[in-house]
Amino acid sequence: AVEMPPKPTDRPLRLPIQDVYKISGIGTVPVGKVETGILERGKTVVFNPSQKAAGVKDIEMHHTSHAKAEPGDNVGFNVRGLAANDIRRGDVAGYGDNEPMFVRHDETFVGQVQLMDIPKAIGVGYTPVFHAHTAQVAVRFVELLENSKTKEANPAFLKTGDAALVRFQPTKPMAIEQMDAFPELSRFAIRDMGKTVAAGVCMKIDKK
């Protein structure tokens, strides 16, 4: 029999939010899939980058109520004291003792990126849309650090087929994690002109 890898239940909670519903008589219900850790009824979760906190009143899966949810579970959970527009798709829920990481619009992160289908050579200033977990954020290329293929430092531009280390700056706060901390939430795809042009991972976040 094929052994399934153990679920990452012993790691801090990370739950990317796919949608947020306002349900009459119940309140605000974020929906998403647990990536790591355990979501528990009665605990307080923090949503980043919205930076809102709320108690978990109930957890629902397949129309039944549960006390907890584990990695791989798709859940809706009812939170106390938050309006539906306080949080949004692209937020990640975690606990206060290990909050989900996010990069503000005045901060940067370094990513290792593979360019698959870029229409023309790109350089500093290129600002396509990054898709990371459930977030979609326009992100600017602020520094080309190295062409990983040719080992050239600070290349002037990059083209299809290149791999590179790039410093990125999101145009608005964006939840993303470092590869060494949460590989599940470090990956991103880059889309432009309606197609995926590159893929990468976040290596290092530079917080201010």
Feature locations, PLM:
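Conserved catalytic-core segments of large NTP-driven translation/proteostasis enzymes
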Residues: 1-120
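C-terminal effector modules of nucleic-acid-centric enzymes and ribosome-associated factors
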Residues: 82-208
